[in-house]
Swiss-Prot record:
This is Enolase. Catalyzes the reversible conversion of 2-phosphoglycerate (2-PG) into phosphoenolpyruvate (PEP). It is essential for the degradation of carbohydrates via glycolysis. GO terms for biological process: glycolytic process. (2R)-2-phosphoglycerate binds at residues 163, 337, 366-367, 388. Its EC number is 4.2.1.11. The active site is at 205 (proton donor), 337 (proton acceptor). The lineage of its organism: Bacteria, Pseudomonadati, Pseudomonadota, Alphaproteobacteria, Hyphomicrobiales. CDD domains: enolase. The gene is eno. Signal peptide: none annotated.
Amino acid sequence: MTAITNIAAREILDSRGNPTVEVDVLLEDGSFGRAAVPSGASTGAHEAVELRDGDKSRYNGKGVLKAVDAVQSEILDAIGGMDAEDQVAVDEAMIALDGTPNKARLGANAILGVSLAVAKAAAETAGLPLYRYVGGVQGRVLPVPMMNIVNGGAHADNPIDFQEFMVMPVGATSLSDAVRMGAEIFHTLKSALKKAGHNTNVGDEGGFAPNLPSAEAALDFVMESINAAGFKPGSDVVLALDCAATEFFKDGAYRYEGEGQTRSIEQQVDYLAKLTEAYPILSIEDGMSEDDWEGWKLLTDRIGSRVQLVGDDLFVTNVERLARGIETGTANSILVKVNQIGSLTETLAAVDMAQRAGYTAVMSHRSGETEDSTIADLAVATNCGQIKTGSLARSDRLAKYNQLIRIEEGLGAQALYAGRSAIRQLAGR
């Protein structure tokens, strides 16, 4: 009844107008699952490989017809007839078929699309929403959103070197209340920027991309907007940064080209520490470069007891790199991006390893997204307590927030909003 009988794939467009892979999986009993694969702008060197065609005559070489063909030929031949309810076996079969350590032959975009669509089809067979199918009865924690309201770095065309400035409504009473708070801050910020003569265009993830001179200038606007919206910074709302430091780490130093500054590894640690003292910043993602393990350790020893330090490019949702971080006491949180590793099974393994080691996990989108809202379900299924899915603009971002609102409604009295407990450094305050 739950055997995989057909798999179809197609080339669709993501939120940046670039091609991506969408996969449909059909089961013997007629159950159906569909998944679309996201794509990143600032990608870590250690991520699984996203297979692109390289044909400059189509989509400037970014087509994904090779990945689509892999799904409908080799992958279908390999897993057709397998039981969709045996997710691990399905994913392992695709990984073995690919035969490379980073999914470079078939493409992580091909394998992930099938992996997620299989899970959705199996959930339909079971008559369960995806979060319940994956997480069981324990999946009931609604995550605190990291709402990216100011964009810089690779996500915007402005002088700000840091990639994301986010608000986290830890003082909300529910997920829907958190979304309301974020939306009110977002619109208040828009008014403040407009009043100060800045443009209110948005970046890839829906946050504003004003022509501000520094991180401090962006943080000041965010703080002003939190207060003006009627909330208390540090209590109702805390701040989070994604420095995406790999993007500006060159020749052993952190080169802030937008700000005209160069900082050594030690100076980068000092700078981030000072920012956390000046502003209610409780989470910093990729404050150091992906292979600057020395800098990461210095940063962790310096502020890790009071700030969540999230490894994105550092860990790339990979259990081998995460294990090294745990062993060396580097960072204390992992950003979870399904397409960094390329299958649902491996994603869940990374979350499990992190949680067992006392690390937090943050479920995350990519800058190139679609209307697919799978990560909302996975955030609840894994009880990770935090989700990073962009700003309060652009339907590709709002699809995830709206799905979380639906999940919260479906859970009813069982729903539990993570709130202050989501960040361990904040929970005891």
